[in-house]
Amino acid sequence: MLIEIPEVLTKEQVAQCRQLMDAAEWVDGNVTSGSQSALAKNNMQLPEGSPVARQVGDLIQDALGMSPLFISAALPLKVFPPLFNRYEGGQAFGTHVDNAIRQLRGTNFRIRSDLSATLFFSEPEDYDGGVLTIEDTFGIQEVKLPAGHMVLYPSSSLHHVTPVTRGVRVSSFFWMQSMIRDDAQRTLLFQLDGSIQAIGAERGAGDPEVIRLTGVYHNLLRMWADS
């Protein structure tokens, strides 16, 4: 399941974050690569744990916590602190799959990567290329979203970023461990939650069918969830 989540950050927040990031020091993006990714990766990255990365990352995590669409789609258990990359001058990221396990450097914090996310900090018209192309059971999807918008997709997906031939592409990328390991089960719960919300808006939260379906949702969540 691939989900676009609009306006995770406002345009004002994006501008403030870009001001901080544009003034920061960037390093070779391979500092966070696995062995496979290192062969395909050519970009720059904010150092993990840098003050700017922490500040903007905290803002992103706070915003995600207030996004009903994100919570419904991801059912997050743990979120890896957001990282940040920058592409320009022909830089690209070849086809790869994300590592199954991610550990935060110098800590015992680690997650199973069930879902991957990219949050855009550059407007589509400000750069050429830089298309995130994702391959999975839903087919091949090309993603290039407005600044402040985010895409969420299974970490098991093959994906790549096409060369940036004009301008600069800045984004945040991170992973999360969902309470629901299986993508098909997570998709079913997301669809069921959406139907409950739609019926509830039409009939009211006290409608017997809304109550019954809400019970079904929570019983499935109870059956499948890790916590």
Swiss-Prot record:
It is an enzyme of class 1 (oxidoreductase). Keywords: Dioxygenase, Iron, Metal-binding, Oxidoreductase, Vitamin C. Fe cation binds at H96, D98, H159. This is PKHD-type hydroxylase Mfla_2317. Its EC number is 1.14.11.-. GO terms for biological process: DNA damage response; intracellular iron ion homeostasis. InterPro entries: Oxoglu/Fe-dep_dioxygenase_dom, PKHD_C, PKHD_hydroxylase, Pro_4_hyd_alph, Pro_4_hyd_alph_FE2OG_OXY. It comes from Methylobacillus flagellatus (strain ATCC 51484 / DSM 6875 / VKM B-1610 / KT). Binds 1 Fe(2+) ion per subunit. GO terms for molecular function: 2-oxoglutarate-dependent dioxygenase activity; iron ion binding; L-ascorbic acid binding. Pfam families: 2OG-FeII_Oxy_3 (PF13640), PKHD_C (PF18331). Residues 78-178 form the Fe2OG dioxygenase domain. Transmembrane segments: none annotated.
